[in-house]
């Protein structure tokens, strides 16, 4: 039995805080070839997850809030936000499923946020994700501007 408890969430959150990318995965699947990828994803505010989609092969992806507050954002082909959901288990907003071929990303809105993520496998880094050409590359100086634009949109809508 794999146990997901406060100790595990604290452990992965602490690793995310120390990571240059401000996030950390904890995989439950044993092999990249597993047909169901399951993981914890600890994300700190300021971490940039470049918008991407999963197609060829198509993959569904679901996110569930275990701790903290996280925004899951969907975009159209031009980079306009089409929909978003704030995941916050304390407000009974637990999760979302993102359809294959859908541009999406996520942003942490609170320190020590952790999601449980489930995605169709297998994982092959060469074809797992298609990154959006309209979004800055990870590590670029424009990623903060992009994050701020999304946060501004979300806060304006609330």
Q: Which residues fall in each region the model found?
A:
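A short, N-terminal "cap"/entry segment at the start of jelly-roll beta-barrel domains
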Residues: 1-37, 84-89, 144-158
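Conserved short histidine dyad/triad with adjacent acidic residue
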Residues: 40-59
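His/acidic/aromatic-lined binding-pocket segments of jelly-roll/cupin-type domains
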Residues: 40-41, 60-65, 96, 106-107
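Short beta-strand His + acidic residue motifs that chelate non-heme Fe in jelly-roll/DSBH
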Residues: 51, 72-74, 96-98, 104-109, ...
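Glycine- and acidic-residue-biased ligand/ion/polar-headgroup-sensing regions
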Residues: 58-78
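Short acidic-glycine-tyrosine-enriched beta hairpin
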Residues: 62, 76-104
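Double-stranded beta-helix
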Residues: 80-81, 105-158
């Amino acid at each position: 039995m794999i146990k997901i408890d406060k100790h595990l969430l604290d452990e992965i959150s602490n690793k995310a805080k120390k990571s240059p990318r401000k996030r950390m995965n904890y995989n439950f699947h044993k092999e990249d070839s597993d047909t169901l990828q399951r993981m914890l994803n600890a994300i700190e505010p300021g971490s940039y997850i470049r918008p991407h989609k999963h197609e060829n092969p198509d993959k569904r992806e679901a996110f569930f809030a275990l701790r903290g507050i996280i925004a899951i954002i969907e975009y159209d082909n031009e980079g306009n936000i089409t929909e978003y959901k704030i995941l916050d288990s304390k407000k009974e907003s637990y999760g979302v499923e993102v359809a294959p071929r859908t541009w999406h990303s996520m942003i942490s809105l609170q320190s020590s946020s952790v999601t449980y993520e489930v995605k169709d496998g297998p994982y092959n880094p060469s074809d797992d994700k298609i990154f959006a050409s309209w979004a800055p590359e990870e590590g670029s100086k424009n990623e903060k501007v992009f994050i701020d634009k999304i946060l501004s949109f979300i806060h304006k809508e609330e």
